[in-house]
Amino acid sequence: MPLALFDLDDTLIDGDCATLWGRYMTELGWVEKTAFLHQERRLMELYAEGRLAMEDYMDFSLAPIAGRTPAEIAGAVEDFVARIVAPRIHADAVRCLERHRQAGDRLLIISASAHFLVSAIGRRLGVDEVLAIDIEERDGLYTGRTRGTLTYREGKVRRLDAWLAQEGETLAGATFYSDSRNDLPLLSRVDRPHTVNPDPALLGHEIGRAHV
C-alpha cells in the first residue's frame, strides 16, 4: 500500500495552525495579546527564512498550556478547529486526499506543529494517522515542554523512519506534498515529491508542482 504523506500548514490549510492557535489563545485570555503576537511573528519570520530553532518556538508557544489538562485543551481545540481552521481547508486538498484514499493509499499527515492540533485537524480531514510534535504530560497536566524528536526538517525524516519500521511500511512509491523549504530533507526521500504553494526557496528546486 503506497503512502501519501502530507505537510499540514500552508499545504492542506491556508495558514499555519500554530499561528492561528496563538491568536485563538489571545481570544481566550490565556496570553497578553500584543506581546505574544509580536514575539510569534518574529519567530515565524525566522521559520520562513529557514533559521528557526524549533525548540525556541515550541517553548514559547506551549507556555500558555502549561498546567492545563489535556481535556481542557481538547475542548478548546475542538472549537478552534470548527470555527477557525475548517474555513481555511483548501477544497483542492480535500479532493487530493480523496483521490489518494480511493487509490488505496495510506494517508499520513506529518507536521511540525503540536500533536494536539494536528490530530484534531487530521480528524476533520478524515486522516487518522499523524506524526507531529509530542507534548509532555506529568500528573495529568501538560508541562509546556515537548517530548522526543521534533517533526521538523531532518526530524521529520527520523520520526518517519521510526514509524515505517514500527508499521512495516516503506517509502516505495510514496508521495509527499509540502510548501516549505524546511521539508526538503523529506521531499528528497520520496519517489513522488510535490510542492504546493511553494515558498521562494522551493521554487528553484526541480520538484513537481501540485495543486492541492
What are these model-derived regions, one by one?
Residues 1, 75, 82-211:
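C-terminal cap/substrate-recognition subdomain and adjoining C-terminal extension
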